[in-house]
A protein has these predicted regions:
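N-terminal active-site segment of His-dependent metallophosphoesterases
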Residues: 1-64
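Active-site-proximal beta-strand elements of phosphoester/diester hydrolases
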Residues: 2-16, 115-125, 154-156, 212-218, ...
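Active-site neighborhood of phospho(di)ester-bond hydrolases with catalytic His/Asp-centered motifs
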Residues: 6-8, 47-53, 77-83, 122, ...
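Feature marks short, surface-exposed loop/turn motifs that line or immediately flank catalytic pockets
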Residues: 10-14, 87, 125-127, 161-163, ...
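Short glycine-enriched, charge-decorated loop/helix-capping segments at active-site entrances
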Residues: 18-25, 168-174, 230
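His/acidic metal-ligating clusters that form di-metal
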Residues: 33-47, 131-213, 249-250, 269-270
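Extended active-site neighborhood of metal-dependent phosphoesterases/phosphodiesterases
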Residues: 60-147, 176-192, 210, 215-218, ...
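A short C-terminal boundary segment appended to hydrolase-like catalytic domains
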Residues: 243-271
Length: 271
């Protein structure tokens, strides 16, 4: 069994740069409350993942604020960059979480524990707030997957590579839809990939890409949440808990979904 706490889209701001506004204080307080809630979980998650947009402007000062809060977590945290992040500054402040694991250009890396694998997929695009999936990135991802094909694998990335619209108009947050189609084809041919964890759209959304379960979570910054009923009125902090467990006595075969149980829980914290 492995348990993962997912947070995303904290969008922290630096008071020095924008003044002591209510939004600055609120976002800092949101993250502090989230950390307190995760630290009070029993049992504790095995690891915490942050699926991007740690800060609003990507400054060292903003990441320093994030670090002062996130270092209070009882368990380790790992990151994948969002469109608002500055990757060199993210690496500079969160050295232990990133520097030895990431490619110089792309933040694509993996960790293995308890018989499972987690892979960060970098969807950052230098000239757009939308995501980018290039052949170079997919090749690096493929290399990470191929190192341990027998392990059930979850990918965490900022931009969800699927339609996130609740209405008839399709909304896919990528600069090149053809890249997304190629990525889907790639994923569907990898039977050991069991889940994608995403952020970016600031609301809870669940879908599938073939056999793969996909989860997109709300923003920790409640003023940016699409779920205004929750964020504005009740001020609840939301994050996701994911648990994977193997069925005893079974070997991993082609249909990985038959031997891995995926549970998700939306946690509302309203102290």
């Amino acid at each position: 069994m492995i348990s993962i706490a997912q947070i995303s889209d904290t969008h922290l701001l630096c008071p020095v740069n924008v003044g002591e506004t209510d939004i600055v204080k609120q976002r800092i307080n949101n993250l502090k409350r989230c950390v307190d809630s995760i630290n009070n979980l029993d049992p504790q998650p095995d690891i915490i993942i942050h699926t991007g947009d740690v800060t609003q402007n990507g400054t060292v000062e903003e990441y320093t604020i994030a670090d002062s809060i996130l270092k209070k977590l009882k368990q380790s945290i790992i990151f994948t960059p969002g469109n608002r992040d500055n990757k060199p500054n993210l690496r500079k402040i969160f050295t232990q979480s990133l520097s030895e694991k990431t490619d110089k250009e792309f933040y694509i890396y993996s960790i293995e524990f308890k018989g499972f694998k987690l892979i960060s997929m970098d969807t950052f695009c230098s000239n757009s707030n939308k995501g980018e999936l290039t052949s170079s990135k997919i090749k690096l991802l493929s290399n990470e997957i191929s190192r341990s094909k027998s392990l059930p694998t979850a990918i965490f990335m900022h931009h969800p590579p699927y339609n996130v619209s609740d209405n008839e108009f399709e909304r896919i947050e990528y600069v090149d839809i053809e890249e997304v189609k190629k990525f889907h084809y790639f994923l569907k041919n990898k039977s050991n990939i069991i889940a994608l964890f995403c952020g970016h759209i600031h609301k809870y959304f669940e879908s599938n890409i073939g056999h793969i379960r996909t989860f997109t979570m709300p923003s920790i910054a409640t003023d940016l949440s699409w779920d205004k009923e929750i964020s504005k009125k009740s001020k609840k902090i939301q994050y996701l808990l994911h648990s994977f467990s193997k069925k005893t006595g079974n070997l991993y075969k082609k249909n990985i979904s038959s031997v891995v149980r995926i549970l998700k829980k939306l946690v509302n914290h309203d102290k």
